[in-house]
Amino acid sequence: MRLDRLHIQNFRCYEDATFDFQPGFNLVVGVNGSGNTSLLQAVAVSFIELGNAMKPAEISLKNEDIRFVIDRLDGRSRYERQYPLLVHGMGNVFEATEWMMKRDGESFPHLVDSGFGTQIDKIRKQINLAVEVDLPVLVFYRSNRRWQGTGVSAESAAKHRVSRFDGYLNWFDAVADLSEFESWLIGKTLERMQNLLDTKSTSTEFDDELAWVNGAIECAIPKAQNLRYDLRLQSLLIDIDEHKTIPFNELSDGQRGMVALFADIARRMCILNPHMGKDVLKKTPGVVIIDELDIHLHPAWQRSIVPALKKAFPKVQFIAASHSPQIIGSLKPEEVIVLNDGNASHPRVTYGLDSSSVLEEVMDVAQREPEIEKLLSELFSTLE
């Protein structure tokens, strides 16, 4: 599954624009107000019908997705919505190479041309017959994510029954409800304890879904290990720096964000493709959309997060947005999409640049404040 091209008309700030994406990592870069978030929203909207077919939900095009212009006449202002609204995706989703959502007017429902529903019906029948079908991950992480726990009890988690299609729950806003995230982690901890009782094993080495999720976390933070649920404390815990155990909710925003992002993607993959076993993170394809990739992250982690995502989930197409020079400098030019007045282009060079060079070469920002630059220029002129 991948998105190769997206054509949008009258979507938020875009009148008519087309964007091309790489199969691997894509980072959208632009000044505030240039349309970064709107583009990521359009990418997510292009998959609404797929997500709804996988896990029925009340997600559809909204009025705020429709571009409007302000008409002024005799001192009065009118806000006029612009139609048609079009979101046209091209790529590869099961057997579909093109899919479209369109709305021709305010009184018209949105029209869909995708064939996703028919394809998903076939897949459901195959799964019911125990056929091993690979399901792609699809999830959108918005910029307002905080990853605060919700306090799910072990009792409720033990009663929870998971379907493969639960991997798509809340895909359109992955951090809106963390109860599924917590419930799964608690359930897997209880499952591990039950297996130890059944086998009378005393081993502390595990090769289960919880271990695979922790493997993804270690790609992000090498010294972070063993995210699990503690029955006595009734809390999620994680080991940081070998001998330091911290409750998940007491991690810094940056630590919690890194741990939860990698854990949630891995968790969804484990739910979607249990037949893949220990190779599930390496083999699961899909599209993951992340707004403000650098949010709450220390510059060192900003530099390492893209390589870590690529290593942990090599088959996934990432479409993300960021203003971080450290992240931009960790990517090749073809992986960076620079937005300027609604137009997209690739920078001449990015990979390996220091942050100051990225600011100047890619983001068109001076390395120093203008007043300082002027003083330095005068100083050098005097020295000469």
Where are the regions a protein language model picked out?
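P-loop NTPase switch/coupling surface
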Residues: 1-180, 378
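Switch/communication elements of ASCE P-loop NTPase nucleotide-binding domains
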Residues: 1-55, 216, 230, 234-370
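Aromatic-acidic/polar surface patches that form glycan- and anion
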Residues: 32-33, 78-80, 202, 206, ...
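Solvent-exposed, amphipathic alpha-helical segments
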Residues: 46, 188-191, 268, 375-382
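Soluble or luminal CAZymes and related metallo-dependent hydrolases
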Residues: 115, 119-122, 205-212, 257, ...
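Amphipathic alpha-helical domain-onset/packing element
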Residues: 135, 179-232
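Short coil/turn segments at secondary-structure boundaries
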Residues: 153-154, 229-232, 371-375
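Charged/polar low-complexity intrinsically disordered segments, enriched in acidic residues
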Residues: 362-384
